[in-house]
C-alpha cells in the first residue's frame, strides 16, 4: 500500500541519491568516512531510482544471473533479479552456507576475510552480474569473481550504488566493467 511510509519523489535522481547517502565520520573506526545507504532505503523514490538505473544499464547485456555480495548487495540484487526474471546467487561470508561451496579468502585493510558461494548455484556458461552497495578496494568483488569463474560462469560486470575510485579498485579488478550510480573521489565529508 503506497503512502504508509515516507515517499519522496526526487526532482533529480542523482542529486537525491547523494542527499540520501549518509556520510558518517570515524565509523566504524577513526579516520574512516562511512557511506551509509540506509537513507536510500528510507526513500522509496530514491531506491526505485537505483533499481530503474540498474535495469536500464543491463537490459540489453544478456545477463543470465545476478550474484549479490553479503549483505547489502542482497538489497539491490533481489529486486533486480525479480525485474529481470533471472536467478539470484548469494555470495556469503564463510560458514553461512550449507553444502558444497567454492571459497575464496582475500585481504582487508584490517585483516582477512573469506566468502563462499554454493557450487550448485554457479552454472557453467552463465553470464553473471556481480552486485553490491559499494565498491571500495575491490577485494570482495575479486574474490566473488574468482569463485564464479571456478564454476565456469562468465562475470560480465559489476554494479554498485556507490563507487570509491580513490581507493583504486580498478587496480585489483582489472578489465571487469564497473557501473556505479555515484562516485566519491576523496575520503571527506564535504
Swiss-Prot record:
It catalyses: AMP + diphosphate = 5-phospho-alpha-D-ribose 1-diphosphate + adenine. The keyword Glycosyltransferase applies. SUPFAM superfamilies: PRTase-like. It is found in: Cytoplasm. Its EC number is 2.4.2.7. It comes from the Bacteria. It is an enzyme of class 2 (transferase). CDD domains: PRTases_typeI. One of its GO terms (biological process) is AMP salvage. GO terms for molecular function: adenine phosphoribosyltransferase activity. Pathway: Purine metabolism; AMP biosynthesis via salvage pathway; AMP from adenine: step 1/1. Keywords: Cytoplasm, Glycosyltransferase, Purine salvage, Transferase. Its main location: cytoplasm. GO terms for cellular component: cytoplasm. PANTHER family: ADENINE PHOSPHORIBOSYLTRANSFERASE, PHOSPHORIBOSYLTRANSFERASE DOMAIN-CONTAINING PROTEIN. Homodimer. Catalyzes a salvage reaction resulting in the formation of AMP, that is energically less costly than de novo synthesis. Belongs to the purine/pyrimidine phosphoribosyltransferase family. This is Adenine phosphoribosyltransferase. It comes from Treponema pallidum (strain Nichols).
